Amino acid sequence: MQDRRRGLVRRALEIILLDSDLNVRILTRSPLAEQDFDLYQQFGTRLLFGMSIPTLDDSLSQIYEPNAPGPQAKLRTLERAVAAGIHVYVAMAPTLPDEGEAALRKTMETLAAFNPVSIFHEPINLRAENVARIEAKARELGRTVNSSVFQSRESWRGYAFTQFALVDKIAQEMNLADGVLHQWPDKTLASKPGFMRMKAMQAERDLGSSFSTQLRKAASDEWSTSVLPWLQYWHNPKERVSNWPSSDGRQNHQNNQPAPKR
């Protein structure tokens, strides 16, 4: 079945190559894609090849993506794609709550070394039924996972905003070229009531206090001046499409305005 599916995909790509001027973006987790690099090469700047690499940690990869190839196999595939002259991009997604700034930085630096046209980023957003499965897999491998972020929508919101802010910070410190990083915030994050509930939960957890009028005003101001503009920027359809390679280098960013800082 897998060989048949691959044959159908290859045939479709051959038709696109010969009978159209369409561009093609491929995203996969499978190193088997290397078998078609000869065809990808023929597309030139019309094709972008991408790998999904959320972490460099092999055991975390086994926990969250038990049926996917490990990160080292994916990195080798990217390396061979670049060596073959194929333009590449990376989905650093979904990143995991078990990794902090140091691990995220190492992943981003490793991926940036491939000179990808784009790096997409999105934090993991687990459905409730998957949490128990991941916890069980972690126990099987002798590890624990930070599943507390999935206990409520508010706890997940806090995790997601923290993760986005960390990735923005790292990209700035790496001097990543404008337009390379693409953040993919979930549309449900664009809710001021949800943001305020998250802030109230954080006040009780971190400060041991109620959500006072002063804290409520500070949170409302943060939403209006910082969080909402950031979300609106990344929810703009122009920003949800990556750059495209051209014969003289990377094309200009779709939107000439840089991403707002939070």
Task: List PLM regions with ranges.
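Conserved AdoMet/S-adenosylmethionine-binding subsite of the radical SAM
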Residues: 1-162
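Auxiliary Fe-S-binding modules of radical SAM enzymes
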Residues: 102-262
